[in-house]
């Protein structure tokens, strides 16, 4: 499982960074978080296939986070995507998409389900638990917390060998079922499994100033994706426009007890001094990393 950053810039495209779009890649699915202008073009230079994208989460309706959505939806159909595409986003996204697709005469070969979210709501999506919280921006904005299911512990192979259980299909049954039968005797599978492994926990935040919603979403996650539009010297400016500095993002990560912080939504004004932002974050939280376009990060629990 990994994050793949398609766009890490703020406000408008630059020569170095496209606007917001992040893919979450899993062997069983591909998700997107935001879909700014030219996201589908960024995909041409990535391992991501548009027709494989099954779910898109939109954090808010500012253009740098959604203007790539109609084009992506259309291209997904042209590339023979036929499976359901689900889009989560703030109130208004359904009306905007329906009007855009209608006016442009866009025909989709697949079902499209647009779900307008509210703070505090939870969803089950493709085996993951999704929780939504409101953030504090100049515009209605949300963040998403993603939690995977608890995984069963590792097999106690030596104990099974001592019992005489041969490797093969029965091992798979032990991992999948509550009990198993060997040579006429029923056993509890848990007696031959290690401690359960907690499911992966992630949080992807939209544009925001530091707020309680950010802390709730980020609490003890394995990876937090947080905007870092400005340097610390621009903190007042960041607040006026509903954004965070890299240091403020790191403070959220520290308070919330996260394992790793990925910084994105970087202003073009820092094109020659981006490491300054990362350094300011690391003064507070060492596991802070400033992302670039087409950078991927493997997610570990």
Swiss-Prot record:
Enzyme class label: hydrolase
Keyword Hydrolase on entry: yes
Enzyme Commission number(s) from the entry: 3.1.26.11
Catalysed reaction equations from the record: Endonucleolytic cleavage of RNA, removing extra 3' nucleotides from tRNA precursor, generating 3' termini of tRNAs. A 3'-hydroxy group is left at the tRNA terminus and a 5'-phosphoryl group is left at the trailer molecule
Keywords, in A-Z order: Endonuclease, Hydrolase, Metal-binding, Nuclease, tRNA processing, Zinc
UniProt remark on cofactor binding: Binds 2 Zn(2+) ions.
Family recorded in the similarity comment: Belongs to the RNase Z family.
Assembly and interaction partners: Homodimer.
Name the UniProt record assigns to this protein: Ribonuclease Z
Species of origin: Exiguobacterium sibiricum (strain DSM 17290 / CCUG 55495 / CIP 109462 / JCM 13490 / 255-15)
